[in-house]
């Protein structure tokens, strides 16, 4: 039995997230269907994250076990011939049987892209959040520092989150503006349900002048979800990389 590690990318627009569901189409389902067609066996796929509906990925990691005699070097090619055009395998390799794509992670990197201007984009609109109002980027940048480090992020998780602990460590949070495109990058040891989207939504409130820079610190310390901003739409979010 071989343990195969995959790195995949996907456009999450038409999917109800990563995790298999009974009444919806998901990335995990499509990948497991392709593996079953290729190997003749059903192999549950273990994902490194549970991305939400509409979220994209450029470097999602997963693994599955198989007794198939397909050479490991050919798995990438075979699966790509069977997967829909909005999912692709970037790399495949055999790893130690102990490897678990979720439990072995040491961190993840996400990006979030916003487009400003007098009209929403047409090309690529499914990958960005159009935001018409003017933002103070310097205030947003200055607010980012409050998120860096180890904190209780209870104020930045969706109600109903089943995480045992709300303590997470953010190693990097940057914002870059080029013309009418604003891109956030965030690196951390792990993220709570909707955490990245709520953080970005809170930073937009700072950029609009509704929240002061210092208020961000207060939100963190309050651990109160009601005090933070609304989550931004899923379509601007992309899982860039998973660290091991």
Curated annotation (Swiss-Prot):
Substrate binds at residue 110. Its EC number is 5.4.99.12. Keywords: Isomerase, tRNA processing. GO terms for biological process: tRNA pseudouridine synthesis. The active site is at 52 (nucleophile). The keyword Isomerase applies. One of its GO terms (molecular function) is RNA binding. It catalyses: uridine(38/39/40) in tRNA = pseudouridine(38/39/40) in tRNA. The keyword Isomerase applies. It holds the Pfam family PseudoU_synth_1. Homodimer. Belongs to the tRNA pseudouridine synthase TruA family. Formation of pseudouridine at positions 38, 39 and 40 in the anticodon stem and loop of transfer RNAs. HAMAP family: TruA. This is tRNA pseudouridine synthase A.
